[in-house]
Regions:
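Pepsin/retropepsin-fold aspartyl endopeptidases
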Residues: 1-188
Length: 188
């Protein structure tokens, strides 16, 4: 079990490992870096130098923050993971990590993507758990008639740059209520 310090930038989780800034991205299936391998947790791991035409420098420019590696699910999925925002740490382990929580919820994996079920406006909604996304996205039926709380620019490799309205909406897991900043993906 190894505990790493994390930083956050514009909603992104940045893991610091031996001076390298690593974007933790559960929404990306593959790891991307400048080189085709890198050392992590005492092992050498394969990574792509680009994905869908985007290299790590392109990703850094889109983020306005220089990262050395985007760690995707091909690598994250090899470990148990615990993210603790309050202590600004992330723990990786080859064995299950014991912890206490006010609630637990099943996390599902579908073709390498992680999803979680939230209750939003008394309806269960399955959403992607994407630590690489700075905005959580939900269907327009949930944001209809909500108060607009500004706009944000985001990027999706299949869509490009786009602007989305932002809404603060309460969600819950097992009765634990928390605010979420939701946006809407553009119509495709």
């Amino acid at each position: 079990m190894t505990v790493f310090n994390i930083d956050t930038f514009d909603g992104h989780i940045i893991l610091i490992d031996n001076g390298k800034k690593i974007l933790l991205d559960t929404g990306c299936p593959y790891t991307i870096g400048i080189h085709d391998t890198f050392d992590f947790m005492g092992r050498q791991h394969h990574c792509f130098t680009s994905l869908a035409g985007f290299g790590i420098n392109d990703i850094s420019k889109l983020m306005n923050y220089q990262v050395d590696i985007l760690m995707g699910m091909d690598l994250i999925g090899q470990y148990y993971l615990r993210i603790e925002y309050n202590s600004k740490t992330v723990t990786f382990s080859e064995n299950e990590i014991p912890f206490q929580s006010i609630c637990t919820t099943p996390i599902r994996s579908n073709m390498g993507a992680i999803s979680v079920v939230l209750s939003v406006k008394n309806e269960n909604v399955t959403l992607a758990l994407d630590t690489g996304a700075k905005i959580s996205y939900i269907g327009k039926k949930f944001t209809h008639n909500e108060v607009l709380n500004g706009k944000k620019t985001d990027f999706n490799p299949m869509i490009g740059n786009f602007e989305t309205p932002i809404y603060n909406i309460n969600a819950s897991i097992e009765g634990v209520v928390f605010p979420v900043k939701f946006g809407n993906l553009p119509d495709m």
